[in-house]
Amino acid sequence: MKPRFYWAACAVLLAACSPEPAAEKTVSAESQTASASAATLTVPTARGDAVVPKNPERVAVYDWAALDTLTELGVNVGATTAPVRVDYLQPVFEKAATVGTLFEPDYEALNRYNPQLVITGGPGAEAYEQLAKNATTIDLTVDNGNIRTSGEKQMGTLARIFGKEAHAAELKAQIDALFAQTREAAKGKGRGLVLSVTGNKVSAFGTQSRLASWIHGDIGLPPVDESLRNEGHGQPVSFEYIKEKNPDWIFIIDRTAAIG
């Protein structure tokens, strides 16, 4: 130990052991409270407002949408689920500790990682109660019927937590510009149908569903069928149905390619 640092350390220890006048104790308590307050912030979640650590270093994520957003914001995620087939997220999965799957968290692995904050949402939020017993946990599930606005709100929340507000504002401006361009391009171009394909099964999604709400709402492409189901994994349909409706545009999500 260098002499100067040694004497400084001794001075700090002596000061800590010395009795404080009542007034100084009050000031010290107020300073500690202010410091603790500065280290946390209150953010909106799907379960109401929550107090979270500000700019936590050890973060575990059980929501792929949040993982995508955090990666785009340049936030390091130390732990997440087993990999999924999203090419640009593979570097994240390779570096991060695996703490289970979206539907089955590995609580032993999570405890070993010792996160300061756990972020969940969507299907992963089913494990919220148990996750919250292990660490501070927030549910950032987006509103399926309002994906764009809800997604931007999620991005804003994450940006506040990690001090990335400026970057988030730039991303929002880019997103807004893309939506405006696409909405203009879609005007008068017919009607659309959003489908999900799993093997030989085909499902169609309603205007307020998780896969179609932004296409029909934010882009403004009219649907070929207003009666389609909005909940869950869509409404099973046949090829005859598709032929009968005869959409001008078909948007297909290949679920088999995504999850295997």
List PLM regions with ranges.
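Bacterial Sec-exported substrate-binding components of ABC uptake systems
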Residues: K2-W7, C17-W64, A166-L195, R255-G260
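Soluble non-cytosolic domains of exported or imported proteins
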Residues: A60-V61, E104, G121-A125, G145-E152, ...
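Extracytoplasmic/secreted envelope proteins and their assembly/folding machinery
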Residues: P53-P56, D63, L67, T71-G74, ...
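A short, structured surface patch at a secondary-structure boundary
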Residues: R58-R112
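Binding-cleft/active-site segments that stabilize strongly anionic ligands or cofactors
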Residues: V92-L140, A186, R191, V197-G260
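Extracytoplasmic substrate-binding proteins
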Residues: K133-N200
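Short, acidic/turn-prone active-site loops that include or flank metal/cofactor-
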Residues: A82-V86, G124-A125, T141-N146
